[in-house]
Amino acid sequence: MILSLLSMNINYNSITSIKQTLKERKIAPRKLWGQNYLINESIRQKIIESLDIKENEKIWEIGPGLGAMTEILLKKTNLLTAFEIDLKYSEILNEKFGKLKNFKLIKGDFLKKYKNENQNIDKIFSNLPYNIASKVISKLIEENFLKEMVFTVQKELADRITAKINSKNYSSFTVLVQSHFKVIKILDIGENNFYPAPKVKSTTLKLIPKKNNIKNFKEFNKLVRTVFSNRRKKLKNTIINFITNKATLRENFLKEYLDKRPENISVEEFIQISNTLNAYH
């Protein structure tokens, strides 16, 4: 097989070069998989710098696409494992990086494949497809697979992740993420920095794992999702299904929250409420 010189030397800053490569490989960017290419080199560099890769660290990249970020990451890490669901992109990645000793390509859906890989990794990186970003983050938390992560996501989702108590964006997802990670906003990215240009702005976030005191994650997650599904209701009207012992309601700590709505309760307070309810089970 004769490899295409153009495809092997993609100018990631050039829409013309990207278009030509896609045309050559008969690839049409798929919205379903968030196939928008970041064409601003300085932004790419800034995002990678935020990973702060140390010597000997092992990195996972979810959805490398044409390999713009992959190319930079491979210069900084001893081992990069890339998960790519699109077989046509996998072919390009293999051609460009397959002979490098520090590159490993996993073909298929990250959520279905990652458990089969060596879990001894240090950091995870991705420009996450907008439609699955919350699913990926939630799944990693639910599986207690907590690593330092840098993700670029839809700004609307980032606003929920970084939301403060008493704000409209404060949600169950806010509580889920902030209970497990310190969240740092790296930068906002305008639509014109991508090809094809998405209809929404993007934001890059850094998630750093932190310790918490959640006694029963399953019950905590269920509690938070339930009360936020009725966010205009006061807590006393939504936690009734979690109370198996009426003595729970006499807890002085719990009493002060019964007349509050979920957006008025902090992440740490949700943890304490969940632990209190769990103690009476």
Curated annotation (Swiss-Prot):
Function in brief: Specifically dimethylates two adjacent adenosines (A1518 and A1519) in the loop of a conserved hairpin near the 3'-end of 16S rRNA in the 30S particle. May play a critical role in biogenesis of 30S subunits.
CC terms in the record's Gene Ontology section: cytosol
GO molecular function term, any single one: 16S rRNA (adenine(1518)-N(6)/adenine(1519)-N(6))-dimethyltransferase activity
Assigned keywords, A-Z: Cytoplasm, Methyltransferase, RNA-binding, rRNA processing, S-adenosyl-L-methionine, Transferase
Record flagged with keyword Transcription regulation: no
Record: residues binding S-adenosyl-L-methionine: 36, 38, 63, 84, 109, 127
CDD domains with a match to the protein in the record: AdoMet_MTases
Protein name per UniProt: Ribosomal RNA small subunit methyltransferase A
Organism the protein comes from: Borreliella burgdorferi (strain ATCC 35210 / DSM 4680 / CIP 102532 / B31) (Borrelia burgdorferi)
4Fe-4S found in the keyword field: no
Entry-linked InterPro entries: KsgA/Erm, rRNA_Ade_diMease-like_C, rRNA_Ade_Mease_Trfase_CS, rRNA_Ade_methylase_Trfase_N, rRNA_adenine_dimethylase, SAM-dependent_MTases_sf
Location relative to the cell: Cytoplasm
Reactions the enzyme catalyzes: adenosine(1518)/adenosine(1519) in 16S rRNA + 4 S-adenosyl-L-methionine = N(6)-dimethyladenosine(1518)/N(6)-dimethyladenosine(1519) in 16S rRNA + 4 S-adenosyl-L-homocysteine + 4 H(+)
Protein family: Belongs to the class I-like SAM-binding methyltransferase superfamily. rRNA adenine N(6)-methyltransferase family. RsmA subfamily.
PANTHER family linked: DIMETHYLADENOSINE TRANSFERASE (PTHR11727), DIMETHYLADENOSINE TRANSFERASE-RELATED (PTHR11727:SF7)
UniProt-listed Enzyme Commission number(s): 2.1.1.182
Pfam families in the cross-refs: RrnaAD
